[in-house]
From Swiss-Prot:
Keyword terms of this UniProt record: DNA-binding, Mitochondrion, Nucleus, Osteogenesis, Secreted, Transcription, Transcription regulation
Keyword Secreted attached: yes
Assembly, per entry: Interacts with transcription factors ATF1 and NFE2L2/NRF2; the interactions occur in the nucleus following metabolic stress. Also interacts with transcription factor NFE2L1/NRF1.
Protein name per UniProt: Mitochondrial-derived peptide MOTS-c
GO biological process: activation of protein kinase activity; negative regulation of phosphatidylinositol-3,4,5-trisphosphate 5-phosphatase activity; osteoblast differentiation; osteoblast proliferation; positive regulation of protein serine/threonine kinase activity; purine-containing compound biosynthetic process; regulation of carbohydrate utilization; regulation of transcription by RNA polymerase II
Tissues showing expression: Detected in plasma (at protein level). Also expressed in skeletal muscle (at protein level).
């Protein structure tokens, strides 16, 4: 489980 895939839901602004 990568936080980037599931973390994007919590921190979509950091990835996007």
């Amino acid at each position: 489980m990568r936080w980037q895939e599931m973390g994007y839901i919590f921190y979509p602004r950091k990835l996007r």
